[in-house]
């Protein structure tokens, strides 16, 4: 435990996650409920189907949110706290957690009870699944457009090579 606390003091990445977990680290370790899932980890770490992260990796041209009209940067916190596309899912979450959806408050809720953990996990699963499906659809559409452009160029090139 002391080694973990020391490593967290000298962090190199994941600042927001560390700051959220550090105050409840002992409770996090001792809890008997909840398991981390892929999608829950995406929201806690900010590494997932978020415009900022995908843009940084070169998989999106901008970091803007594709799901709302605000033009805000798409981050885990934007998804958790603000994005209008997830209002219904957020309503279910707030009913259990209260209105403070800051990362430290969400982590405290998760550690505090299995009901809290399940509410946060359910939000993450539902929202991230929808975001992943939307990202795959954007990739398919982009790939289809790219193939159509290549095919048209090839046809023109083939036509130019035909004898008169």
Predicted ranges, named:
Residues 28-164:
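Family-specific functional microsites
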